[in-house]
Amino acid sequence: MYKRQGQKSEKEKFAGARATYSIEAMMQDGKALQAGTSHFLGQNFAKSANISFINKQNQSEYAYTTSWGVSTRLIGGVIMTHADDEGMVVPPRIAPYQVVIIPVIKKPEDEDAIMAYIKEIQKDLAGKTPFGEKIRVKLDKRDRASVDKFWEWTRKGAPVILEIGKRDADGNNVMLKERIKLGTPEGKQILSRSDFEAGIVERLERIQKEMFEAAKARRDANIRTDITTPEAFRAYFEQSNEWIEDGTSGKVAFVRGKWCGDPESEEILKAMKITIRCIPFDQSDSEGICLLTGKPAKILFQNCYRRL
């Protein structure tokens, strides 16, 4: 999940706060998810709750308080950022299980040999530390068809799935499937056991990096910076209101541009069902024209998006 961070506008900040800062993540459909917030409350709430302290001058003073955090919406953010039509795609760093092993037992007499081979692999994997942590491996021994178990773990987004049968055990190989490459020639590989074990840490770290870079590239590709006048701004979002069956408009979702900072100008956005997501921390000193009023402006604001 890739995001932008900045300060909320006066109308979008938390009621009663002196300032609100947020992390805004772009979902695959172009909408913004406020993934986390931090509110500087000043002394407002301390006064109402009569919270005070003795300062350096040995005088009583109302406390300066904050309110901040993230919540379970991050789980939804991960799903909406990386999922595909087959289900979840979970980044290896946070996946409950980074490697899932599915025994493929076609004959009862093969079970002992297959399970003994899998236990050897599990033992070797136990010493692996992707991202500086002990690798998380799940052996799915449930009495269910292996194909059903594969699709269940695919829907759950397991980064790497191993399917190991008698032929693999006899050949000292593994059948490996990568979730992010599902349906591609690279998504299914037969590897020697030694190559798999030697490369699993690098593989998981590569998957993590590829997922991050894909989310970042999608975000950057869907931010317009070439809209520089109120007329172009209005025209863009009026055209973007035409939604097609799959839930998208064919238009990018975010616009980044100049704003004069006038709180009353946000009423223009309200009428258009658009919001200012944040005022990014990475500001430039260049002057421009406010996209809402046409007045001279220096403040760079970002993430206007269609509110359905």
Map each language-model feature to its residues:
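NTP/phosphate- and nucleic-acid-binding module
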Residues: K3-L308
